Design a protein with these regions (language model features):
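Surface-exposed cleft-lining segments at the edges of enzyme active sites
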Residues: 8, 35-39, 149
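Short beta-strand->loop
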Residues: 10, 64-65, 124
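Short conserved beta-strand segments at catalytic cores or DNA/RNA-binding microdomains
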Residues: 18-30
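Conserved DEDDh/DEDDy metal-dependent 3′-5′ exonuclease domain
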Residues: 32-120
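Acidic, Mg2+-coordinating catalytic module of metal-dependent nucleases/exonucleases
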Residues: 113-181
């Protein structure tokens, strides 16, 4: 299983939207491995896409949070525009948003990942940069700005892909083994 998340230049998902960061985690002997790819100039996108492709094998199962509707289609479009075949076609993809909604809709105010982290997993992010601020942080960096905000985007993405692994284990646990009030 490869848990993955992207940070992008916007939420529209059109051809002008780029993934400037791809994060992924997977279970390896000894624990959870996290890998991140970040482009620091626009011409690096094809190389980032090629490297992400190397992380995928025929038996890979993707796991995401809203990735079936957003991250995977966005990456597929970027592979097409880079004239690279998409490695995502035909790969099994589990989007944790849907089982999470089935379980927690109406229990909490929403099913945003931060809400699920706090209420179901007991994770409270300290000094987290909201994902909505990631595009601005990246663009500021490209324009010669401080890398401090970009480091916060990396940390945000890191936490997202770690949380996905915890959430899958939480959702798979028997009801009496779960914590978090639901």
């Amino acid at each position: 299983m490869l848990f993955f998340d992207t940070e992008t230049t916007g939420l529209s998902g059109g051809t002008g939207t780029r993934a400037f960061m791809v994060g992924a985690s997977d279970f390896v002997p000894g624990g959870l491995r996290v890998r991140q790819l970040l482009i620091t100039h626009l011409s690096a996108e094809p190389a980032m896409l090629r490297e992400f492709s190397r992380w995928l094998a025929e038996d890979t199962r993707l796991v995401s949070y809203n990735g079936r509707c957003y991250d995977a289609p966005l990456l597929a479009a970027r592979y097409l525009l880079a004239r690279q075949g998409t490695p995502l076609a035909g790969i099994e993809h589990l989007d944790l948003l849907f089982p999470t909604r089935r379980r927690y809709r109406g229990v909490w105010e929403n099913c945003r990942l931060a809400t699920i982290e706090r209420n179901a997993l007991g994770i409270v992010r300290e000094d987290d940069l909201p994902g909505s601020e990631a595009p601005g942080a990246w663009l500021q960096y490209l324009r010669g700005g401080d890398a401090g905000l970009l480091r916060r985007v990396l940390q945000h993405n890191f936490q997202d892909v770690v949380t996905l692994a915890h959430l899958l284990l939480h959702l798979a646990a028997p009801d009496d083994a779960r914590t978090g009030g639901a």
